[in-house]
Amino acid sequence: MSLKFTNTLSKKKEDFISINPNQVKIYCCGVTVYDLCHLGHARSYLNWDVLRRFLIWKGFEVKFVQNFTDIDDKIINRANKEGCSTDELSERNIDEFHKDMDTLSILRPTSMPRATKCLHQIINFIEELEQKKVAYSSNGDVYFSVNKHKNYGKLSGREIENQIDNAAGRLKTNQKESKKNSLDFALWKKSNSGEVSYSSPWGNGRPGWHIECSAMVKQELGESIDIHLGGSDLIFPHHENEIAQSEACNGKELAKYWLHNGMVNVGGEKMSKSLGNFTTIRSLLEEGISPMTLRFFVLQTNYRKPLDFTQEALKAASKGWERLNNCLSFGYIYKIKDQAKNEIILDKPIKKSANTNLDKESFKLLSDFERYMDDDLNTSGALSILFELSQPIRKIINFLKEKDINEVDQDELNQVFYKWELLSELAAVLGLKVNLNHENPKNNPELDTNKIEELIKKRSLAKANKDFLLADKIRDDFKNIGIDLIDKPKGVTEWKQLSD
């Protein structure tokens, strides 16, 4: 089966054929750096991390560019509120972004351009649009003339006439005076008095949101790319406007394939900062949710579908990851492999290995894994293959609870180790990284008693508040690090370290 993606542009699943053989150019819309990232951001970037890892595994050379929007209204307002400069705010949140993404084992992009560092390219891009008569200046602003682009609406499927009526009702008084058409969008915005601004041929101001991405794509990857990525909330107007201005400027298709991930929902509503129903990545990690549990949770659902966030779903994902991690730990605990194989434990993308020692059943599972992933990144199907591969490993693990490894038939043991190597390779394609300390308390003998007592108090408070999901989660977390909790009368809880 050939690699297929659901292309938002064509509204159907298509065979993937890169512009240049064995090379893939990808652009992913990044964050506006005015605050910490939430689970919705994690969902998006985890999905695209797996896409990138899978393409590398299949032998493609991948150039992956993701931007930072480091100047816009939200950043200006937040900086004013905090009493700092927009540069200070952006720099701090870029650092925090990297911390979150590194913790989640998301590969860093090949390049991460920032809007404020690409002003020359942005201004040149706007000037080209003016020369082509598809942009016009008005009172210090510059707008893209939507009527001049005949294919406007081809990505979102929206009819331009309906959008004009809708946009007209939302215009401010000054916009009505400046725009020729209510749907025209800003390429350059005149700055208000006292606001951060940059010099340009049209006066002091700052770039519009959409033009940033078009200029950065052209600067980093060229006029046409293979894949453009983003959340489904960006299809209109952001990606629609990107297409319009890029194709008007360059006379070429901006991207062959447009992939969009579904939203994370909380109680039936999209998780977003504007609604105030968001949960930051940082807060989830501080609550004790492991990075790999978050990755596992996200990969259980196809990237295009909505993802419902509940504590119950997180708890189920934690148990699923724990089972898988037990099997991934097996080879490192019972057999020290060579250094090349040990690299699987690291956050490195890997290429498909020869797998010459696999039996017929394992070859079929390898083929099934690739078939699932080729089918529009069916990560839930791919995870099912990992669990099938885990079965003989789990059987050996259970056997070794009572017996010594030397009592296992050597040929059988060798086949199990070959399956473990394949399991480790395929898990790495999904970015699932084995956590040895998590499953083996002997690797982490020094226990922080103050932290233990603090968590026991937190669990007692959760029980008192009838938050039994949290109480059970804390108990499970203790078990995972080799600690057993014993509840006594009068609300007293004692703990002991489990024997190896």
UniProtKB/Swiss-Prot annotation:
Motif placement: 'HIGH' region: 31-41
UniProt motif ('KMSKS' region) ranges: 270-274
Catalytic reaction equation(s): tRNA(Cys) + L-cysteine + ATP = L-cysteinyl-tRNA(Cys) + AMP + diphosphate
Entry binding sites for Zn(2+): 29, 213, 238, 242
Cytoplasm as UniProt keyword: yes
Enzyme Commission code(s) on record: 6.1.1.16
Main localization of the protein described in the UniProt heading: cytoplasm
Residues binding ATP, per UniProt: 273
Keywords: Aminoacyl-tRNA synthetase, ATP-binding, Cytoplasm, Ligase, Metal-binding, Nucleotide-binding, Protein biosynthesis, Zinc
Cofactor: binding details: Binds 1 zinc ion per subunit.
Pfam families: DALR_2 (PF09190), tRNA-synt_1e (PF01406)
Gene Ontology molecular function terms on file: ATP binding; cysteine-tRNA ligase activity; zinc ion binding
Cofactor list: Zn(2+)
Subcellular location: Cytoplasm
Domain of life of the organism encoding this protein: Bacteria
EC primary class: ligase
Family: Belongs to the class-I aminoacyl-tRNA synthetase family.
HAMAP family the record matches: Cys_tRNA_synth
PANTHER family xref list: CYSTEINE--TRNA LIGASE, CYTOPLASMIC (PTHR10890:SF3), CYSTEINYL-TRNA SYNTHETASE (PTHR10890)
Subunit structure, as described in the record: Monomer.
NCBIfam families assigned: cysS (TIGR00435)
The protein's name in its UniProt record: Cysteine--tRNA ligase
Species name: Prochlorococcus marinus (strain NATL1A)
